């Protein structure tokens, strides 16, 4: 890592190995950042040193199937319940009872599940882009599709058509990603834009057209340096070439088991912890600004703060200053005891 303040560490037990980045005082309150698809602990490079500077012990693991953490060969190994246990084991390894948990993309359902199944392990939770509810599976979130944008005859699963594509043709969905991780990441790591508002997201066409309209690999487009540097991109590419996309894509293959797990949550799935949700205005797949997608979260989270950031899906990289400020301001109000020392 380029930043000397960030250490690389590994924790292993009989069931799993977690590689993680660590920054800040080891006796500070713990804050754990969970990345999503198809990323790495590196995705939190703008957050780790910032929160370490506030006195937190800031941690970001490679989630299972990614980077230098354990990679598994069966879809069912990527159930949410498994990832939740990975994180609880990591917390035990750090010898602390609680943490502030922060998630993005698939990291969010893990954070929501920790909060709803193990609230005693949380000071509070923050999620970026993905509201509470997606851990209940594809059929559940389809109910909240905006049919003005996604007519049911054209897009039965709305913006989630790409998830159907994984279920119906997993190998076909994964093959073009494995063919060239470099062009794949350059194609998807892009800033948000207001131009896509009130139009179907690209993910809505994947089931009919494939990820890249029938191409055998992602188109060769310039890297968006507002999201990622060449050095950072090379790190992502190295590990996706080594591990492949089977693990990352398998996270999408467990909707039924994830629903079963969510039904076991405490307190009828209500979350009474201090909760912050950051919505990305230009994230048109996880669209929560004008659609009903965030309704279950608003019904089930009793201490919820929401804020909209003018960014696309890769919100923590595109607008790190705004994201860090929003989290810090929320902490001063919701968890002041963590910032007083």
PLM feature segments, named:
Residues 1-9, 337-341:
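Basic/polar N-terminal segments that are highly enriched at the extreme N-terminus
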Residues 2-6, 17-18, 30, 66-102, ...:
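Flexible "cap/lid" subdomain of the alpha/beta-hydrolase fold that forms the substrate-access gate
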Residues 8-10, 58-60, 306-308:
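Conserved beta-strand scaffold positions in the cores of enzyme catalytic domains, especially
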Residues 13-23:
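A short loop-to-beta-strand scaffold at the N-terminal edge of the catalytic core in hydrolase folds
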Residues 21-71, 90, 104:
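Conserved HGGG/HGGXW glycine-rich cap/lid loop of the alpha/beta-hydrolase fold
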Residues 36, 79, 105, 318-319:
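Active-site helix-initiating loop/hinge in glycosyltransferases
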Residues 37, 41-44, 106, 112, ...:
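Signature tryptophan residues that serve as conserved aromatic anchors
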Residues 301-341:
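Catalytic active-site module of serine/aspartate enzymes centered on a nucleophile-bearing elbow/loop
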């Amino acid at each position: 890592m380029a930043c000397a303040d960030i250490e690389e560490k590994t924790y292993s037990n009989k069931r799993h190995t977690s590689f993680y980045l660590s920054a800040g005082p080891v006796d500070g309150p713990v804050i754990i950042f969970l990345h999503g698809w198809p990323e790495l602990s590196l995705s939190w490079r703008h957050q780790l040193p910032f929160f370490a500077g506030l006195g937190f012990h800031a941690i970001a693991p490679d989630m299972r199937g990614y980077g230098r953490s354990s990679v598994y060969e069966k879809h069912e190994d990527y159930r949410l319940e498994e990832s939740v246990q990975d994180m609880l084991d990591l917390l035990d390894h750090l010898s602390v009872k609680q943490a502030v948990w922060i998630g993005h993309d698939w990291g969010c359902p893990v954070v929501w599940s920790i909060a709803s199944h193990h609230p005693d392990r949380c000071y509070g939770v923050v999620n970026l882009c993905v509201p509470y509810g997606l851990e209940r599976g594809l059929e559940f979130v389809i109910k909240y599709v905006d049919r003005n944008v996604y007519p049911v005859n054209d897009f039965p699963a709305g913006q989630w058509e790409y998830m159907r594509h994984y279920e119906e043709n997993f190998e076909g969905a994964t093959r073009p990603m494995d063919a060239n991780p470099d062009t794949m990441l350059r194609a998807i790591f892009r800033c948000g834009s207001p131009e896509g508002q009130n139009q179907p997201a690209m993910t809505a066409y994947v089931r009919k057209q494939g990820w890249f309209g029938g191409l055998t690999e992602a188109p060769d487009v310039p890297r968006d340096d507002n999201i990622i540097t060449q050095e950072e991109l090379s790190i992502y590419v190295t590990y996706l070439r080594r591990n492949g996309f089977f693990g990352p894509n398998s996270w999408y293959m467990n909707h039924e088991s994830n629903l079963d797990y969510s039904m076991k949550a405490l307190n009828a799935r209500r979350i009474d912890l201090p909760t912050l949700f950051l919505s990305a205005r230009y994230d048109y797949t996880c669209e929560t600004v004008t659609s009903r997608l965030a309704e279950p979260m608003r019904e089930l989270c009793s201490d919820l703060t929401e804020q909209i950031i003018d960014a696309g899906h890769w919100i923590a990289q595109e607008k790190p200053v705004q994201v860090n400020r929003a989290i810090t301001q929320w902490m001063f109000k919701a968890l002041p005891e963590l910032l007083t020392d």
